[in-house]
């Protein structure tokens, strides 16, 4: 539904189906004067229900080109992802390569990579719109693009020209699937405590140490690997980033390379790519694969990616929230009570739906604003942190309300809302915990508003 004020009248449009309804100023003014009343919320709930077939509520401010891109990815999700997502989750399957190949054809992995390196050269804003659509179908699908995003951002901001020319076209085409090998056991969010070592030895670095929570680690072709090159430099300064190539593994042989071993971590949600522990024991990386060909810049290079990564993660959260909203709303409309009435006609259920739609729109606009600031080249760690924190909270709240609307059925694994709840929980943890985001926001507020 697109809500807009034209003259003195409130217009509600369904962009997709061409529906146009118009109500006079009296009804519009009543909604304002009555405030957050049950009656007003029920009116809004009815407007949402009337436009539900469009799956697009509120004016998100997309131009015509971006709207076409959104529709293209929505069709892909509806055809290839949504019908299969719950089965992938329940069986804990890797996302099929056939689906990844379709994503490659659509340009998912090269969206923000400049055209001169084989990408589409799209904006961070467009990337948000696409990511939300992908995550709306399945968080694992939306997160596949994140692997390429992180790798591309590292290369664009910190790589040599030779490294950019070698890796960016392969990442953009989907020929090379990257993964981030960062977190270590017992380190939590403290990168300065990392112990994995990279020792220069002739034309190679030898990697020794342990990593955990490696998303898509087995099936990837190149690792963004953070290791300590200078043991005398404590904290962040001794860390370096490597573009460590590896053989692609599978469920039967996860890590075929000499010097790498590991295993799968069974997880509550966020499936489809799988999580791994990895042990490095004498694994070789060519010296030319040191990012930027300069030691000690690893943490700084990672910092360069944080704004983009958190904006993209906020977009993933929006997709999960939208999925929870649509799933709950459809269930409430279809499910009849003992008197033959729809659950959606119950004020408490309708009120939950209205709150979900409102919170999603608020989080979406904050995320879009952060993305636009990033596209302008402005510092946006404050906005990115806020967007990630808010969108993650909204996703969890929407999933929780969705389960409640389903009642006992929401607790049954056969219903997709149970998967959405599991998927939404990770959003407050990865790519910077909610607590880390709060710290960032606090520091920025203090620095810009000193006492």
Residue locations for each model-derived region?
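Single conserved hydrophobic/aromatic residue that forms the stacking wall/gate
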Residues: 1-7
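Glycine-rich beta->alpha junctions and the first turn(s) of the following alpha-helix
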Residues: 2, 57-71, 136, 256-361, ...
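C-terminal helix-coil-helix/basic helical segment that borders enzyme active sites and/or dimer interfaces
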Residues: 8-9, 13, 82-90, 330-337, ...
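Amphipathic, small/basic residue-rich leader segments at the start of a protein or domain
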Residues: 8-145, 166, 170-173, 177, ...
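N-terminal glycine-rich flavin-associated loop
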Residues: 81, 142-162, 188-191
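A structural signal for short hydrophobic beta-strand segments in well-ordered beta-sheet cores
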Residues: 196-198
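A short core secondary-structure module
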Residues: 204, 208-258
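Internal helix-turn-beta structural module
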Residues: 408-436
């Amino acid at each position: 539904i697109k809500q807009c004020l034209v003259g003195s009248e409130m217009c509600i449009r369904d962009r997709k189906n061409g529906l146009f309804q118009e109500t006079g100023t009296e009804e519009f003014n009543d909604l304002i004067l009555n405030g957050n009343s049950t009656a007003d919320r029920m009116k809004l709930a009815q407007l949402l229900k009337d436009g539900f077939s469009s799956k697009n509520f509120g004016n998100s401010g997309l131009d015509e080109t971006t709207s076409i891109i959104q529709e293209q990815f929505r069709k892909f999700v509806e055809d290839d992802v949504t019908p299969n997502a719950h089965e992938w989750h329940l069986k804990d399957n890797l996302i099929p390569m056939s689906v990844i190949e379709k994503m490659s054809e659509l340009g998912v992995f090269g969206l923000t990579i400049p055209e001169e390196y084989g990408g589409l050269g799209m904006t961070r804003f467009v990337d948000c719109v696409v990511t939300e659509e992908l995550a709306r179908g399945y968080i694992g699908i939306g997160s596949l693009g994140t692997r390429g995003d992180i790798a591309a951002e590292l290369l664009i901001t910190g790589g040599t020209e030779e490294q950019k020319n070698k890796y960016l076209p392969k990442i953009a085409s989907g020929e090379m699937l990257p993964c981030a090998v960062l977190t270590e056991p017992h380190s939590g969010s403290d990168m300065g405590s990392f112990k994995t070592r990279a020792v220069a030895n002739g034309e190679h670095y030898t990697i020794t140490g342990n990593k955990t929570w490696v998303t898509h680690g087995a099936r990837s072709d190149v690792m963004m690997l953070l290791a300590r090159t200078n043991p005398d430099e404590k904290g962040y300064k001794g860390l370096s980033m490597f573009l460590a190539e590896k053989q692609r593994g599978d469920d039967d042989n996860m890590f075929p390379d000499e010097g790498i071993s590991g295993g799968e971590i069974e997880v509550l949600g966020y499936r489809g790519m799988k999580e791994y522990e990895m042990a490095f024991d004498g694994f070789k990386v060519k010296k030319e694969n040191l990012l930027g060909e300069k030691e000690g810049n690893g943490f700084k290079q990672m910092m360069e990616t944080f704004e983009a990564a958190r904006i993209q993660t906020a977009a993933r959260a929006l997709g999960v929230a939208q999925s929870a909203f649509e799933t709950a709303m459809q269930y409430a409309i279809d499910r009849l009570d003992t008197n033959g009435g729809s659950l959606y006609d119950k004020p408490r259920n309708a009120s939950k739906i209205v709150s979900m739609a409102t919170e999603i729109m608020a989080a979406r606009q904050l995320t879009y604003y952060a993305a636009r600031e990033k596209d302008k080249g402005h510092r946006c760690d404050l906005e990115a942190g806020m967007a990630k924190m808010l969108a993650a909270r909204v996703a969890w709240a929407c999933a929780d309300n969705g389960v409640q609307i389903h009642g006992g059925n929401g607790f049954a694994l056969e219903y997709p809302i149970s998967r959405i709840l599991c998927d939404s929980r990770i959003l407050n943890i990865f790519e910077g915990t909610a607590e880390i985001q709060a710290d960032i926001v606090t520091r920025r507020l203090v620095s810009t508003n000193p006492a």
